[in-house]
Every structure is written in structure tokens, then in C-alpha cells.
């Protein structure tokens, strides 16, 4: 398991609410919680930025983190991430914030301490552009959206 530096920014984290943890041995994501001052009602179409009370420092440029939605919130309640995926670069050290968007038709209450997203570490490969006049041919070529076939 990889060590990840973290700072607790809200004293309720680790006392009133557990630190982010994997739910099962096979879980890929650490659950992030809404460290709000009070329950927040998210109206249909509304987006709100939710603090997690936590900052991390990955440090290794070969890694990044992504903040992803929790599947149940999106499927059952229409609550998804306002930016769809949050990318945390290895050199970022600020608080992890979660943009929550209510794409549903009814108001939804985000409770203080509720699990609202998950954090997943991913490998990163940095590249540089090699400018060429032409590409080696491939079977697909420049075929775009829908080019590889339907269902």
C-alpha cells in the first residue's frame, strides 16, 4: 500500500467522522465526506462546492488522484460531480473540495459527514510532443466518433 501525506483541516475528521478509508479490501476508492457546517439542500440544477476537511500531498509525479462520484448518489438521487471528474495533481497541497451537482428533479439534502465522493490514486505518464509530417498508418486512421462500429 502506498503512503499518502494528509493534513486534517477540520478537527471533526478523525473524531466525529472517520478518516477516508477503503470500504472493503477490494475497494479502489477512499470515501470522502461532506465536512459542512450544516446540512445543505441542493436544489435541482444547483451546484455547490463541498469541503472535505482534508488536504493531501501526493508528491510523486508518477501518480495523481481523481475524485469520482459515488455510484449510488448518481443513480438513486441524480447527484453527480459538477466537473464530472476532479483531477488532483501530484504537487497540489490544498483542501480537497467536491463539486456536487443535482441533475435530478427534486431537492436533495447533503448531510454533514455524508460520504459524497471517492478518491482514487492513478498512475501518470507524462509525454512530450514529437512533431512529425505524417503518422504511421493504422487500421482506424482518422475515423472519429462512432467510427469503430455501433453497439
From Swiss-Prot:
GO terms for biological process: dUMP biosynthetic process; dUTP catabolic process. Substrate binds at residues 70-72, 83, 87-89, 97. It catalyses: dUTP + H2O = dUMP + diphosphate + H(+). Pathway: Pyrimidine metabolism; dUMP biosynthesis; dUMP from dCTP (dUTP route): step 2/2. Coiled coil: none annotated. It is an enzyme of class 3 (hydrolase). Keywords: Hydrolase, Magnesium, Metal-binding, Nucleotide metabolism. Belongs to the dUTPase family. This enzyme is involved in nucleotide metabolism: it produces dUMP, the immediate precursor of thymidine nucleotides and it decreases the intracellular concentration of dUTP so that uracil cannot be incorporated into DNA. This is Deoxyuridine 5'-triphosphate nucleotidohydrolase. It comes from Pseudomonas putida (strain ATCC 47054 / DSM 6125 / CFBP 8728 / NCIMB 11950 / KT2440).
